[in-house]
Amino acid sequence: MVLLHPLLTAAALLGASARAQSVVGTPFGFASGTTGGGNAAPAAPKDTNELKEWLADPNPRVIVIDKEFNFIGTEDTCTDCECCIPDSNTCGDAGQNAIKTEGSDWCGSYPATTCTYDNAGLEGMEVASDKTIIGVGDAGVIRGKGLRLVNGVSNIIIQNVHITELNPQYIWGGDAISLDGTDKIWVDHVKVSLVGRQMFVTGYESSGGVTVSNSEFDGQTKWSASCDGHHYWSVLGYGKGDQITFANNYIHHTSGRSPKIEFDSHWHAYNNFWENNSGHAFDVGEGANVLIEGNVFSNVKTPMNPEDTPGSTFAVNAQDASSCTSALGRPCIANELTSSGELSGNDEAVLSGWPKGEGDTKAMTTDKVPSYVKANAGVGKLGSGGSGAASSSVSITPSPTSSAIPSSSATPSSSAYARRHYARHHHY
């Protein structure tokens, strides 16, 4: 009998897992028809450099994330660099100071300070068209760097990946997933935690045909802009012409911008579960058109920000559920609120101007939402079929280099370049 070395056996199993990996489910909502890397052979990159190369190249790919890819320290650090103390930080080390980004006056007259941060987190990895990025089980983690989809890219699937630890101590520390001028993007079964800025953001250029589904936005943090252990910068939609389906997601321990939506956009938010939000969830600004149905809000202080709602919002209650039939081909589902504030918005103009490209959207009644979402949203749950724990079994804790001075320091020129490059592309 031939005995195989355990390491060789493990490597063989991982290789087989990568080859067998494929997308689970079918894109729906505005992202219907997205195919990503299609029939390209699934392959797992060997290291962070190869991952970056594969994401950015012009070839259709199915990129398998079968382990943790840790980018912290890969682009050096900025030590004792310019930062500021915003008015929101009234709690010292438990709050968030802000990185002073060149080309932006965000820090303005705030008191200056210095801080040390990781350069890799400032700018996401660029993702080219026709890509599928898919994690294996709960092992697929991208630490210290996000994903950036810009400049007309299209046909991309991101599924079953955990993005975490992008300079969570600092405002402007990095965005997990950013879109700016895209089409046909499906973000599914993703988890985001411990970021400095946005968990999911669309920039000023239109991102049409986007669905964010079955994902977990975990706002628990030691560095909170609201000084309460909840992350403020959560989901932001700024694209002119965005069309986004936001369904079956778990948004918890946030304190604002969950989401903030502006400009000429259409968002359909249904069957999401908001839990333990100490501030506001929806913040609907000028030009936005938002349909909110079949969601559950539990212990959410302010489901709709009343101070900034010049946009058009239709938040469905039991009395007007039938109004949706002409727009969606079915009645809407009323929202449910428990130990929460008021969810306002009754503008039926949202329905009369609803885009035709969303296709069929099947919504469940709110009594099923909390258990379904907590069992299915996030990583490691592609085959859960409605069962499982509320969060990933991957234990995410900040690595030592993120809160202490790292072993290597960037030269002044490389740090300045990183800050300038970030500021040119991030004004939201």
Swiss-Prot record:
It is found in: Secreted. Glycans are attached at N276. Disulfide bonds join C83-C107, C324-C332. Residues 389-417 have a biased composition (Low complexity). One of its GO terms (biological process) is pectin catabolic process. The keyword Disulfide bond applies. SMART domains: Amb_all (SM00656). Residues 1-20 form the signal peptide. The keyword Secreted applies. Residues 418-428 have a biased composition (Basic residues). Keywords: Carbohydrate metabolism, Cell wall biogenesis/degradation, Disulfide bond, Glycoprotein, Lyase, Polysaccharide degradation, Secreted, Signal. One of its GO terms (cellular component) is extracellular region. Residues 383-428 are annotated as: Disordered. PANTHER family: PECTATE LYASE 18-RELATED, PECTIN LYASE F-RELATED. Pectinolytic enzymes consist of four classes of enzymes: pectin lyase, polygalacturonase, pectin methylesterase and rhamnogalacturonase. Among pectinolytic enzymes, pectin lyase is the most important in depolymerization of pectin, since it cleaves internal glycosidic bonds of highly methylated pectins. This is Probable pectin lyase F. The lineage of its organism: Eukaryota, Fungi, Dikarya, Ascomycota, Pezizomycotina. The gene is pelF.
